[in-house]
């Protein structure tokens, strides 16, 4: 088999496998979240469908697939229908330059678990993540619903504001490594004390907080509040279109967990006798669990509180961190 044909087949298989695995993990994440919240709140959680309730995911899928797809009479039909797709597509597209595991040999060929090894991987992920802002905006505007419109405005406000913070947080890491490639940043962190969580702790905290906003997670979730704006920009959605928002949200959480692991927690570098692949899965799982834990442990912030936190505290801290990093590198 020629190298060109093998590359095409390999890329196609990797794309299918990555999409299938992340889609399955996004479904499993809903079950994991319900179980984690249940144990933290002294409840049992899903336990009726299958062993320990694990088949609840299948039951939810059947329910969502069989629900009627309703479009409000006054809604802009075309925009209303495509808005949920943008959320899921952008979340999956962000996975392209992410190396999930170390490379390995198979049938005499070196397999790299990454779709596109581009030298501007960080910039690509940031750019695609910013596209996610169009999904709630379009859903809110097209729904012809005041709750959805308010939620869309909140989502745009939060996402645009924290994109600045996350960009500045990553800038300090890029200044040290001199590369925008996620693989180069991962390879730079040799040894546990080489992790950027120790070299750039402030950048880590800032990027983590920005990830909460981009993933629409508590305590920085502005788009859903049953006492204020009901289900936010998803109020008028039903069936699988409603589910697409959550598939995108959980896929975003998984992607964010992997990116945080790669950039700040040593990525897939081996640790003592533990292989790099297992370390990658373990660290990303811990970050993902933190996303779930905060929902049960922290209250929501008001929009004005979140904006004050972003522009008055986090942004100045990010600028100071970049300045100090630059001075240290001179």
Curated annotation (Swiss-Prot):
The keyword NAD applies. It is found in: Cell inner membrane. GO terms for biological process: aerobic respiration. One of its GO terms (cellular component) is plasma membrane. Its EC number is 7.1.1.-. It is a multi-pass membrane protein. Belongs to the complex I subunit 1 family. NDH-1 shuttles electrons from NADH, via FMN and iron-sulfur (Fe-S) centers, to quinones in the respiratory chain. The immediate electron acceptor for the enzyme in this species is believed to be ubiquinone. Couples the redox reaction to proton translocation (for every two electrons transferred, four hydrogen ions are translocated across the cytoplasmic membrane), and thus conserves the redox energy in a proton gradient. This subunit may bind ubiquinone. NDH-1 is composed of 14 different subunits. Subunits NuoA, H, J, K, L, M, N constitute the membrane sector of the complex. This is NADH-quinone oxidoreductase subunit H.
């Amino acid at each position: 088999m020629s190298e060109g044909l093998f590359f095409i087949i390999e890329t196609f298989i990797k794309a299918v496998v990555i999409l299938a695995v992340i889609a399955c993990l996004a479904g499993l994440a809903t079950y994991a979240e319900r179980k984690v919240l249940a144990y933290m709140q002294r409840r049992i959680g899903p336990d009726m469908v299958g062993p320990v309730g694990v088949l609840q995911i299948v039951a939810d899928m059947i329910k969502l697939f069989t629900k009627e797809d309703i479009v409000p009479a006054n809604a802009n039909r075309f925009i209303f229908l495509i808005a949920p797709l943008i959320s899921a597509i952008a979340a999956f597209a962000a996975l392209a330059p992410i190396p999930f595991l170390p490379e390995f040999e198979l049938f005499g060929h070196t397999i790299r678990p990454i779709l596109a090894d581009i030298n501007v991987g960080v910039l690509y992920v940031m750019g695609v993540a910013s596209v996610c802002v169009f999904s709630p905006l379009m859903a809110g505007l097209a729904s012809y619903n005041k709750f959805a419109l308010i939620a869309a405005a909140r989502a745009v406000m939060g996402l645009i504001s924290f994109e600045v913070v996350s960009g500045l947080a990553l800038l300090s890491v890029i200044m040290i490594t001199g590369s925008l490639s996620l693989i180069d940043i991962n390879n730079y962190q040799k040894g546990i004390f080489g992790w950027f969580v120790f070299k750039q702790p402030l950048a880590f905290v800032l990027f983590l907080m920005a990830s909460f906003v981009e993933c629409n997670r508590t305590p920085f979730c502005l788009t859903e509040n049953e006492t204020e704006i009901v289900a936010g920009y998803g109020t008028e959605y039903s069936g699988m279109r409603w589910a697409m928002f959550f598939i995108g949200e959980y896929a975003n959480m998984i992607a964010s967990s992997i990116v945080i692991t790669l950039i700040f927690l040593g990525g897939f570098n081996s640790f003592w006798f533990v292989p790099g692949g297992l370390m990658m899965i373990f660290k990303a799982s811990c970050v993902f669990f933190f996303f779930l834990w905060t929902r049960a442990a922290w209250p929501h912030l008001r929009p004005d509180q979140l904006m004050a936190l972003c522009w008055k505290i986090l942004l100045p801290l990010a600028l100071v961190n970049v300045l100090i990093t630059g001075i240290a590198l001179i």
